[in-house]
Every structure is written in structure tokens, then in C-alpha cells.
């Protein structure tokens, strides 16, 4: 249970216009710390009674007893620092117990991405869908994730008015933190999205500019339980994730089958490795994969930052960190 100071802090986050996801994350961090504090001290949480040694003990508990990742612990510390700074500004706290508590040092972790060959196999997996309407819809969904690097929620929130094929641009209105951005579209994405628009989403033509119909969702879902399985505007994030996972399984199976036909053992092993990665493919991995492809082909960090919608360049900089596979290849090359 959160004390009155914490509830005031959470209320001002809402007033300040912080995104709902940010508010939920902050509440979760604070609730986790409060629960630990109450169980440790056997009394109700009181922010004015928190001292530096409490925070150091909590860090040790999270790291050694719970095995939490350094990034997770540091995020919690950051939340507590902002809370205490605000409480002092409001004269609800005299001293800041977080002032001398450092973050846990950690080695930067490279965001997990898929190799180009695995992404290509995923794109080809849509051919296994027997319903041409769903196949084109899945191709459009993948085009947004693979070529534009949008988040899965952003893809599901895209409206018809957000896509301008004439100029080859896409407007993402529901970016993280409520930030919107305008993105250039890869030529392959333009062709795929245009084909989906003409044959599935708007076979009778686009709605009039400025009309209410323009605000309808770009992607469609299917009512499988209804006769004829009609399409309806809009697709839930959960369903979109399931489709990507399903396509990942199909692509993995196809690569496994290719491996059994491959005579070259090294090549067969590589195919199986890609198949293994695709078994757990996720939308966010496709976003990471775009960032790595852009950097590998000479893009600058600010360009990647703009595409992905990162607030801080340091977040984008993580893509420069060698992945485990990069290090593995480097070690193999260094052999005698």
C-alpha cells in the first residue's frame, strides 16, 4: 500500500501529462519498494523514515536474493530518486536518502535482433497463409515492423490518414511518451502497403481527405466465428503479436526442412540456428533488426534515433554494442 506522499506524487504525474504506461511503470516500481520496506521493517511504509542504508539493503536484496537485472534495479532507483527530489521540492522531505546511492554498474547489453536471413525467411512465411486477404494483411503488418521499425502498438494504432504513399511517408501518432513522428518509407514497404490498400483495405478507393473514415484503423482483423469470415477495421495488439509468433514458427519449420535437404553440414547448422531464433521471434526484435541494418549500411545514430523515436541518443547508441553473435564470430576468427 502506498503512503499519502507517494499517492500525491503519482497524482502529479497524471496532471503533468505523463503517458499512462509511464505512470503504471512508476507505480509498479514504488509498490515493489514499499512492499519490501514493509516486510523488512514490519510496519507501514513511511517515506520520511527511509534512510540510505534501506536503499542499499534493497539493492542487495534485489540483486542477490531476487536476481533482478542491473537495468531493472537501476530503473527502480531512478524512480525513487525522482520521487525524493520532488518530495524535497514540495517540502515533504528534509533529506534525500537516494543522494549517495549509486547505480549498479553493468556491461551494456545489445538489443536482441534477428539476422537478415531470418528476417527474410519471416517475410516469405506469409505465403503459407491460404486466405489471400490475411496474407496481404500480414505482409502489411510485417512491412511496418521490418521496414519502418514501429512498435507493435504503434502499428496497430496507425490510421488510414497516416499513410501517404504519394510522398512515401508514414505518420506515427501514438509514439512512446505521446510523441508523434513522421517517417520515410522504404520502397519495398510502399509497394507492400499499396498492394494491401488496393486489394484488401480500400478496394473501392481511399476515403475523402478530412472525412471521419480517414481516421479508421489501417490494419484489419478477421471475424473467424462469423460466416464468411468478414474483415473488420482494427487489430488488437495481442492478435498482432500472435500473428508474428505464428509466422515465426512457420519460417522456423521451413528453415528446418531446408536444413534436412542441405548436404553441406556447416550450411545446415546455420539454417537450424536461424530457425531456432525464429521460434521466439517478436515484433520488437524486428525493430532492433532495422536499427542494426541501418547502422551496418552507414546510417548515422541521429538518423536511427529519428526512425525509432528514441528520446535519448544514448538509447540508440546501444545498437552499437556488439551482440553475443558478433563476439562469437570475432572469437572464432581469432583462433590459431
Language model segments and positions:
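Conserved catalytic core of the tyrosine transesterase superfamily
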Residues: 1-336
Amino acid at each position: 500500500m502506498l503512503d499519502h506522499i507517494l499517492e500525491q506524487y503519482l497524482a502529479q504525474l497524471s496532471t503533468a501529462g505523463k503517458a499512462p504506461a509511464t505512470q503504471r511503470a512508476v507505480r509498479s516500481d514504488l509498490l515493489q519498494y514499499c512492499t519490501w520496506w514493509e516486510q523488512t521493517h514490519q510496519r507501514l511504509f513511511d517515506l520520511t523514515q527511509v534512510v540510505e542504508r534501506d536503499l542499499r539493503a534493497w539493492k542487495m536484496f534485489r540483486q542477490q536474493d531476487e536476481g533482478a537485472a542491473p537495468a531493472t534495479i537501476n530503473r527502480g532507483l531512478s524512480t525513487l530518486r525522482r520521487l525524493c527530489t520532488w518530495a524535497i521540492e514540495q517540502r515533504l522531505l528534509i533529506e534525500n536518502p537516494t543522494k549517495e546511492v549509486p547505480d549498479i554498474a553493468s556491461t551494456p547489453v545489445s538489443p536482441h535482433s534477428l539476422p537478415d536471413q531470418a528476417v527474410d525467411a519471416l517475410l516469405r512465411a506469409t505465403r503459407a497463409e491460404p486466405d489471400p486477404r490475411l496474407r496481404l494483411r500480414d505482409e502489411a503488418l510485417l512491412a511496418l515492423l521490418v521496414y519502418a521499425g514501429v512498435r507493435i502498438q504503434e502499428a496497430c494504432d496507425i490510421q488510414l490518414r497516416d499513410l501517404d504513399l504519394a510522398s512515401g511517408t508514414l505518420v506515427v501518432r501514438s509514439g512512446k511518451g505521446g510523441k508523434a513522428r513522421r517517417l520515410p518509407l522504404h520502397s519495398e514497404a510502399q509497394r507492400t502497403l499499396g498492394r494491401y490498400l488496393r486489394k484488401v483495405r480500400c478496394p473501392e478507393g481511399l476515403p475523402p481527405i478530412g472525412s471521419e473514415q480517414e481516421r479508421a484503423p489501417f490494419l484489419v482483423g478477421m471475424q473467424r466465428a462469423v460466416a464468411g469470415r468478414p474483415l473488420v477495421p482494427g487489430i488488437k495488439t495481442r492478435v498482432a503479436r500472435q500473428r508474428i509468433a505464428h509466422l515465426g514458427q512457420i519460417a522456423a519449420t521451413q528453415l528446418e526442412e531446408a536444413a534436412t535437404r542441405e548436404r553441406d553440414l556447416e550450411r545446415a547448422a546455420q539454417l537450424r540456428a536461424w530457425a531456432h531464433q525464429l521460434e521466439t521471434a517478436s515484433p520488437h526484435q524486428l525493430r532492433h533488426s532495422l536499427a542494426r541494418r541501418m547502422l551496418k549500411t552507414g546510417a548515422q545514430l541521429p538518423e536511427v534515433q529519428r526512425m525509432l523515436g528514441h528520446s535519448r541518443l544514448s538509447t540508440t547508441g546501444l545498437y552499437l554494442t556488439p551482440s553475443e553473435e558478433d563476439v562469437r564470430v570475432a572469437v572464432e576468427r581469432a583462433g590459431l
